[in-house]
Every structure is written in structure tokens, then in C-alpha cells.
């Protein structure tokens, strides 16, 4: 497969399923906005930070390493032993949920029962929901290994929507239930998620005419249950040792992913109300990153990994592939920079309005607007880092990856310390500032690698980080106009003034996008020829 074909495949992969995800996200966005108007920020903080951290930590400790080990090395293996190994996640999950549940109940600060009722029940049910989700782990890994991509999207999206609907119903009709509401909804979510996989494989394996059965290593649903293999070995010990190696390495990822919640939970730098507001703003701010930047990053990592030879100098590779990779990297950097700048510039003037529409005065009257404005800057760094790291990780040699992991280890430690110090100094904004510092270091590392990689070639993909002076001036003018508009029109003067503020923003956004269309012709050509390629209708795979 040539580099242009790989590029076309990566572009289609980046857009496949995106519409479905946007639809599901939009539904849950509306439901969550409705739910927030009936809750206190203390309950939101306990659920979204404290209890969700218990759930995610249990799942991480019980399954993360198993997933990475069992998805390594392709599909050619003794799947009976692999499935047996995956079933060990269930007793591990029981152990970790009991151990962590004891810590959550006995060692951490317990919320005021008058403000957040039924905390102990919430801890028990969130731990139980993690164990229930682990019951579907063998099905999930089998689906991932055989590229049943849309099954994952539909199962997770359906589960989230039904969870949000149940939560909204209980909050509206039984608000006095407190944490019972979210605990039951979480348990319902994991049950539906597991049932989606079980029902799908039951129907698939019960249909002999299905073409997918030819690629699956099992023929009956009972083959997915634990059993002794033909050679008498219950598990593959090589996979088991690999699992242990991944378990040790995965702590770095967990610290970077959930570091803020660990600092909040164990160091008590914020009260439960501030934790709730921070988590809502964090989820709202990261929505664009999850919907747009993450699919692009994942898909074009595959492109770079297939086109370039890992650890080999650019001058020693096929020059056509190197040129295509450089052109794509330049366009992706430009796209990330433009998207990030747009969010940053317009986010400053519309953060308070967005939070007021989404969650009412609970979000828009306190620290929420400052948090979201700060997060808009962080989104710009997230966008650039996603592109630079997807190239860097695809082109680095194993030794370079090991050195990079060492830097990441130092960054994770500094992030925790910096988060603690900055939150003591400036409150919850300190978490975002610490993330910006962390992301800035990672971007610098990746940019240095890209510069060295193309140093002896005629290609300069980092030119994608340069914008025309006219476009930069348009961004600056738009930022100034919308800032003035916010002062005079938002957000205490009623909906006519708000609509006028929105109209000003729409005009400025149109002018900015029009200027970008006229000045960034190379990027427009890339978007038209690659991301705009017509696609066949995909079947569920």
C-alpha cells in the first residue's frame, strides 16, 4: 500500500464514526445540562471526582495492563489462554474495589451527610459497578482485536445516553435520594455496556452464515468462558509476564490522566463544591479535544507509523514517503493551530455565557468563567501536542521512546508537585496552569525531535506553526471586539443583549474563517483532497 493510499485510509478513519459520536455527545450534553440545574455543586464534586476516581482506579489497576498485553502481537495466538488470562481481571477487580473502598470510607474525608447523603452506599455501588464492567472484559478485548470498531462506539454511546436518561428521571422525581441516584445510574451504565457486548457476540456466534465467524477464534459463546486448554496450561505465561511489565509502566499514564483528581482527593486542596465546578468545566472544555483532536491524532498516528520507518533517519528512507509525511504534518500543525487559536480567542469572551446556558448561575457566577477561559488556552496546547506527539511516537526508535518515557516520568512527578503548589496559590485554576506547563514541555520535546528528524532534508513541516500576519491581525481584532461586546452585552442584561453578543461573535468568527480560507490555501487544499474524500458506507466492524 502506497503512502497516498495510507493517507486516504487515515483520513477516512479520522472521520468515520465522528458524526455518530457527535450525535450521542449532543444528546448527553443536553441531558447533563438539564441534570445540573437540580444539583448542588457539592454532590457534583463527590460524584464526578471522588466516586468516579474510585471507579476508574479500580478498573485501571484490574484491567489496563491485561488489555495492553492481550492486544499486543496480533490475533494469531491461543485465544483460550488469552481469554483465561482476561477473566483474572474479575477477582482482581473484587480485591481492588474492596481495598480502595475501605480507603475511601475510612481514610478520606467523608462529606457532610446533610449536604451529600448516602456516601457509603455510593462507594459500595461504584466499586460494584467496576466489577460488573470487568465481566465484559474478554468480550471487549476480542472485539478490539478483531476491529469491531462501531460495536465499541455504539455500546458505549448507548450506555451513556441511557445512564443520563435514568439520572435525569431520578433527579427530577426523587431528588432526595442523593448519591443513590448516581450510584444506581452508574451500575445501570456498566450493566448495559456489558450486555451490549454479550448480546452482540451471542447473536453473532448464533448466525453460522456470518462472514465474521471466519476470522473469530471462537465458535460458541461458551468458548469465551474460562476453561482448561488442550495442552493443559490455563494461561500463557509469556502474556502473563508481559502483563506485569505493562502494569508497572501504566502507572505513569494513570498519574498523568487522573493526577488532578488524586491531588484533590488525597490532599484536600479544594472543597467538594470547587471540585464539582472544576470537573464540569474540565469536561466541557475537553469536549472539543475528545471529539475532534483525538480522532485525528489516533488516525494519523497510524498513517505516520505505516509510511515512516521507525528510528531511521529521514535521508535514508523513501523520499516520496518522507515528503508526503512532511506535507501532512505541516497541514495538521496548521489545522491544530487554527482550531486551537479559534477556541482560545473566542472562548475568552463567551465562557461566561456558555456556562450560564449550560449550568445556570452555579457555574457562571463563581470561579467557572475564569476556569473555562484558562482551559481555552490549554485546548490550544492540547491541539498542537496531539499532532506533534502522534508524529514523534510513530518515528522514534525504541531507545528514543525509552528516553522520552523517562522525561514523562519526571513530568508526572513535577505535575503533581506543581498542581499542589499552584492550587494553594490561586485555587482550581492552578490545575490548568500546571497542565499548561506540562503540555508546554511535551510540545517542546516533540518540536525538537521533529526539527532534528528533518534537519538534513529539504522539508520544513514546522512551517505549519506560522500564520500569515493578516490572519493573526484578524484573530487579534476579533478577540478585542468580542471582549468589548462581552463587557456591554453580557450577561446580566437579558436575552436580547445576549443574542446581540452572540451575533457579534458570529460575525467575527465568519470574518476570521474567511480570512483563513483566503490566506491558508495549502491547508484548504489538504482538507479538500484528504478529509473531504467521499467514503463508502461502512458496515459495523
Swiss-Prot record:
The chain crosses the membrane at residues 16-36, 42-62, 85-105, 123-143, 155-174, 187-207, 335-355, 376-396, 404-423, 428-450, 470-490, 499-519. The keyword Electron transport does not apply. One of its GO terms (biological process) is dolichol-linked oligosaccharide biosynthetic process. The keyword Ribosomal protein does not apply. This is Man(5)GlcNAc(2)-PP-dolichol translocation protein RFT1. Coiled coil: none annotated. It is a multi-pass membrane protein. It is linked to Congenital disorder of glycosylation 1N: A form of congenital disorder of glycosylation, a multisystem disorder caused by a defect in glycoprotein biosynthesis and characterized by under-glycosylated serum glycoproteins. Congenital disorders of glycosylation result in a wide variety of clinical features, such as defects in the nervous system development, psychomotor retardation, dysmorphic features, hypotonia, coagulation disorders, and immunodeficiency. GO terms for molecular function: glycolipid floppase activity. Pathway: Protein modification; protein glycosylation. It comes from Homo sapiens (Human). It is found in: Endoplasmic reticulum membrane. Belongs to the RFT1 family. GO terms for cellular component: endoplasmic reticulum membrane. Intramembrane glycolipid transporter that operates in the biosynthetic pathway of dolichol-linked oligosaccharides, the glycan precursors employed in protein asparagine (N)-glycosylation. The sequential addition of sugars to dolichol pyrophosphate produces dolichol-linked oligosaccharides containing fourteen sugars, including two GlcNAcs, nine mannoses and three glucoses. Once assembled, the oligosaccharide is transferred from the lipid to nascent proteins by oligosaccharyltransferases. Keywords: Congenital disorder of glycosylation, Disease variant, Endoplasmic reticulum, Membrane, Sugar transport, Transmembrane, Transmembrane helix, Transport. InterPro entries: RFT1. It comes from the Eukaryota.
